[in-house]
Amino acid sequence: MLRATEPAHSADLVVFNGKIATQDERGAFVSALAVKDGRIVATGDDRDVLRHADVATTRIDLHGRTVIPGLVDAHLQAIRGGQTFNLELRWDGIPSLADALDRLRRQVRRTPAPQWVRVAGGWSALQFAEKRGPTLAELNAIAPDTPVFVQHLGDSAWLNAAALRALGYDRDTPDPGGGELRRDRYGRPTGLLLARPDPAVLSAALDPAPALSDGDRLNSTQQFMHALNRVGVTSAIDAGGDGLVYPDDYAAVMTLARRGELTTRIAYALGARHAGREVDDFAKWIALTAPGDGDAFLRTHGAGERLLFSAVDLGNFLEPRTELPASLEADLAAVVRLLVRHRWPFRLHATYDESIGRFLDVFEAVNRELPFDGLRWCFDRCETLSDANIARIAALGGGVTVQPRMAFQGEAFIARYGATAARRAPPIRAMLAAGLPVGAGSGATQTAGYNPFVALYWMVSGRSVGGTPLYPARARLGRMDALRVHTLGSAWFSADEHRKGALTPGRYADFAVLSDDYFAIDVARIPQLSSVLTVVDGKVVHADAEFASLAPPLPPVSPAWSPVADRGADGGADDAAGGARARARASAAAGACAEPGMDACRTRGHGRRFARSRFPTASAAGDRCDAFGCRCVAF
């Protein structure tokens, strides 16, 4: 039993009769906790903690449910994601392509002209029973007149014929920088857009599509915060979304913070916006704000993840490793020197050990000139990080945030680099053993989903969402250790490890009551977990199941045709398994090209079952059909 002080009989909230994972030093479980003024004041058994209650105290019987500290997403494009959330149909966690296409069909019927239907990139073709993505023929049949954009992770996107017409794409349209428009034998764009290797080329294709109004962006941000609460996320570190202008594009989240209506705590980084003028960009941010500006719900934290355009170490494993330019060191040193001088924490996207070594050369040189002296900094991702560079990061006081990219791209990594290299990609256990701060984040929302239980599943099971084994037992984490990475571990990256990430007296009363017992259920069921009761700052922000009567009101979704207004349209495995399997069989059988006439695909073996593909390879010579679907012309 843990108890702070003798009770003052004045708790605002007491939850009891639960299985509460405190994440204290001993990893203790308790049955009850008490909250006062947004902070935990006591934890322990029911009898002792209920002594903190009086007639004014709200008491919630947990009925034996499991409680965890609110999850902290250490790498989320929360502010940018909030601005577009109401526009996006999500296929995250849907078990079959047939069901995904059913949702698409329903949304097409609901979407008025000239709006587009957009599927965000947080899904994998290999999560589907059919082991393939949609064909362009399927998209055109579903939406002959409505523009449809379907993004697959950060590697590719499908645009149906209506989208190509809306964009004015034809045989004279050049390939976008950093990408490729697949073409038919006559040079016409087929509708398949490939990131080669920059995923920004995918989202840029949507720039001409209608955007939300200011009022709808505000609503969209509210709905996204609630969606995060529904999966137990109570805090996020915003990694500095590309394309955002500070402070203009932060208006929605700042308005909600000013009104006291944010339900997810956000510490945000600011990134470079102009290639070749990054020092000027950061000098501007330094003049406008400073780390710590804001409050407990919204504040400036630091710089990144884009510190330098030429230092973007992309991780599309369908493409070769990015070769960074020789000018990188001098240019990056100028940026880091400015940040260290002004004591701005910073983060940098880094996939490959070769790049990480060069980045560390710069950091070590700057540190000799201007000591970091406790300044917090980190790398994001680090799939191929070596033991030698783990030691160098530790020596400079840095940390690493990992994202479940291997859960979605593990098969691609294995195809390019081999199963042996994949066994420690990223080397989470080695980083923890070296004493490195390690946090977990989603990388959402454009190229990844926001469900933290996918990351927990990946760290515990060592498997991809498609079921491919990636890691041996010695490289996997236990459930408590994985949870610690996604709570206390992540809190370190915003200097909040003494306020968040554990349920002990004095810390924020941020916690989630789970739909099932994370510590006991079959590991394969972890991605289906959600929160039935989420509390932030001692207040209920989400409630479901037996706690539904406690749910606070949420504004109606706007616009009314938003996918978010359609129950289930934001993803999740809420389909009946038998029906999903039946629809999957039918969908797999329909995988052959449906394009008629002389422009038909004519690819050998086209009618085969897509599920036979061991791994989808977009560039296989002489074979344009794979698990991502048919590459046939969209016209």
Regions found by a protein language model. Give the residues of each.
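Divalent metal-binding segments
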Residues: 9-16, 21, 25-286, 299-355, ...
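C-terminal functional module detector
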Residues: 491-493, 499, 513-526, 532-535, ...
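Short helix-capping segments at alpha-helix termini
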Residues: 258-263, 292-293, 366-374
